[in-house]
């Protein structure tokens, strides 16, 4: 089967924009029609460049870029993407190197995994990290207790210094390791830059419009394009649905992705405080036991706190041999959002001057802020029993203690788009020949692969059309065959539809 003569890509996010970029760089598509559709106007009048949607998921100020995964294929992809983040994609401070402190709770990292321990997720990631890191295990620093973690951060032990320390490797404790091969990216700036690159290459027609429905052939066996809400019809040989949280709705497959929101909070630092943390080579903090992470200081001198997505929590608990059911308020509940024009575009949440959520009828927000506060106090808070009796051994770090108790200055919602298998869906829809391709289900981590996900998607588009000549460069892992299986379309969902 020949390569498509025309494309419609629905969605100018991670999957869609990166695919448009890959097509623009490939001479085989120099004379092909490529249309990129998004309901957000990235190039409004009088703008000097592209402007990202400030409430979209990809508007994040500091998205974690890590290669530390407990799953080999994603670890390999992240390692490949990291090279690009440290090159062209990360120029002009779009990417910032920051080491990662990756932790969980349970027995020592030097012992085998045990059931019901979240540190299993860390142990698996640690083993892969040792394989990928030059120098192996000797080059990866292990922090095998909460006290070691706090000491690494420059804080005092979590217990009064005159009490004995439990060194039992089987005891439950916070344990982790430090990876130097990580950082964060200004996601909004990255999307704006990539959009400008696509426009500069001049091969893609960008259309502002919201897709109302797919357009089918008379016999319903092929997709001919899309119809916009204003009635305009766009046609192409291949339609690619990469619409993020709206993909399930456009495709009419509610259970393809679970769409929901979580809360992100920020603490403002002074310039002096932020500079001091940078001087200390402050790490990204990830505690998979609490399901909480902290990134920064960012370019605005803020620390950002977020929750793992539900899929991320499920992934951690699976490694602990704990089975978790589908979210009880999952797929069906999302339907009420489809008519809301703000759907999947996040949104600000009002907070008081003291950092409390103004909407006191929002228990989810209150729980999120409580989780972040506990996370902070555990790592950065003052030593227990300080102020009672520390036998004159008080060595508390006022900077860290102050941050641990500081009000949150900003809270926002961000949307997640999880697949049941917790893997992306990058494959042809099986019901329409080779006329409808799906690229969605970012599961809270697709942005890490922004520099390479487009070329992988294009390779799968061509390979699955029967082009046996399509391959990745020698030595690149995972192979196209592995990706094709990992990101296959879940045909079983069509039986329930």
UniProtKB/Swiss-Prot annotation:
One of its GO terms (molecular function) is L-pipecolate oxidase activity. Its EC number is 1.5.3.-. Keywords: FAD, Flavoprotein, Oxidoreductase. The modification S-8alpha-FAD cysteine is found at residue 414. Changing residue 121 to F: Severely compromises enzymatic activity. Gene3D superfamilies: D-Amino Acid Oxidase, subunit A, domain 2 (3.30.9.10), FAD/NAD(P)-binding domain (3.50.50.60). Its cofactor is FAD. Induction: Expression is positively regulated by the fumisoquins biosynthesis specific transcription factor fsqA. It catalyses: (2S,4S,5S)-2-amino-6-(3,4-dihydroxyphenyl)-4-hydroxy-5-(methylamino)hexanoyl-[peptidyl-carrier protein] + O2 = (2S,4S)-2-amino-4-[(3S)-7,8-dihydroxy-1,2,3,4-tetrahydroisoquinolin-3-yl]-4-hydroxybutanoyl-[peptidyl-carrier protein] + H2O2; N-methyl-L-dopa + O2 = (3S)-7,8-dihydroxy-1,2,3,4-tetrahydroisoquinoline-3-carboxylate + H2O2; N-methyl-D-dopa + O2 = (3R)-7,8-dihydroxy-1,2,3,4-tetrahydroisoquinoline-3-carboxylate + H2O2. It is an enzyme of class 1 (oxidoreductase). Dimer. Belongs to the MSOX/MTOX family. Amino acid oxidase; part of the gene cluster that mediates the biosynthesis of the isoquinoline alkaloids fumisoquin A, fumisoquin B and fumisoquin C; as well as small amounts of fumipyrrole as a shunt metabolite. The products of the cluster lead to a brown coloration and are important for growth and conidiation. The nonribosomal peptide synthetase-like protein fsqF, which lacks a canonical condensation domain, is required for addition of a serine-derived dehydroalanine moiety to activated tyrosine but is not essential for the subsequent steps leading to isoquinoline formation. Is able to convert N-methyl-3,4-dihydroxy-DL-phenylalanine (N-methyl-DOPA) directly into cyclic isoquinoline, in vitro. The absence of the meta-hydroxyl group, as in L-N-methyl-tyrosine, leads to a 25-fold lower rate of reduction and the formation of the demethylated product L-tyrosine, instead of a cyclic product. Does not accept the D-stereoisomer of N-methyltyrosine, in contrast to N-methyl-DOPA, for which both stereoisomers are oxidized with similar rates. PANTHER family: PEROXISOMAL SARCOSINE OXIDASE. This is Amino acid oxidase fsqB. It comes from Aspergillus fumigatus (strain ATCC MYA-4609 / CBS 101355 / FGSC A1100 / Af293) (Neosartorya fumigata).
């Amino acid at each position: 089967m020949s390569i498509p003569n025309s494309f419609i890509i629905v969605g100018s996010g991670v999957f869609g924009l990166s695919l448009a970029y890959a097509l623009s760089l490939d001479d085989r598509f120099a004379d092909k029609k490529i249309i990129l559709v998004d309901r957000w106007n990235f190039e409004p009048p009088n703008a000097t460049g592209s402007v990202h949607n400030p409430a979209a998921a990809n508007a994040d100020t500091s998205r974690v870029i890590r290669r530390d995964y407990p799953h080999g294929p994603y670890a390999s992809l992240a390692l490949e993407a990291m090279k690009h983040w440290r090159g062209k994609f990360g120029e002009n401070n779009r990417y910032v190197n920051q080491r990662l402190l990756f932790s969980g709770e349970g027995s020592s990292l030097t012992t085998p995994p045990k059931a019901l321990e979240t540190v299993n997720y860390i142990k698996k990631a640690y083993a892969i990290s040792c394989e990928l890191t030059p120098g192996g295990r000797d080059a990866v620093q292990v922090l095998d207790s909460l006290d070691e973690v706090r000491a690494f951060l420059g804080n005092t032990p979590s217990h009064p210094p005159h009490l004995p320390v439990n060194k039992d490797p089987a005891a439950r404790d916070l344990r982790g390791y430090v990876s130097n091969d990580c950082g964060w990216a200004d996601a909004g700036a990255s999307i704006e830059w990539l959009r400008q690159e696509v426009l500069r290459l001049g091969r893609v027609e960008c259309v502002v419009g919201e897709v109302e429905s797919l357009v089918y052939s008379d016999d319903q066996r092929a997709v001919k394009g899309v119809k916009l809400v204003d009635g305009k019809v766009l046609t192409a040989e291949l339609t690619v649905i990469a619409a993020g949280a709206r993909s399930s709705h456009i495709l009419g497959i509610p259970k393809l992705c679970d769409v929901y929101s979580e809360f992100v909070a920020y603490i403002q630092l002074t310039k002096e405080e932020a500079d001091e943390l940078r001087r200390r080579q402050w790490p990204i903090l990830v505690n998979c036991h609490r399901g909480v992470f902290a990134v920064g200081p960012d370019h605005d001198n803020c620390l950002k706190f977020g929750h793992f997505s539900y899929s991320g929590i499920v992934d951690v608990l699976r490694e602990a041999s704990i089975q978790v059911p589908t979210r009880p308020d999952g797929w069906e509940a999302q339907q009420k959002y489809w008519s809301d024009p703000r759907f999947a575009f996040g949104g600000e949440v009002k907070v008081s001057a003291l950092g409390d959520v103004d909407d006191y009828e929002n228990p989810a927000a209150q729980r999120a802020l409580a989780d972040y506060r506990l996370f902070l106090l555990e790592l950065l808070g003052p030593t227990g029993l300080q102020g009672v009796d520390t036998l004159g051994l008080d060595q508390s770090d006022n900077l860290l203690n102050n941050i641990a108790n500081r009000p949150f200055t900003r809270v926002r919602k961000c949307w997640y788009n999880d697949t049941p298998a917790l893997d992306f869906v990058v494959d042809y829809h099986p019901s329409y020949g080779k006329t409808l391709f799906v690229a969605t289900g970012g599961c809270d981590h697709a942005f890490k692969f922004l520099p390479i996900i487009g070329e992988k998607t294009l390779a799968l588009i061509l390979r699955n059309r029967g082009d046996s000549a399509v391959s990745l460069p020698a030595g690149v892992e995972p192979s196209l065959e592995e990706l094709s299986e990992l990101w296959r379309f879940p045909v079983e969902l069509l039986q329930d539809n």
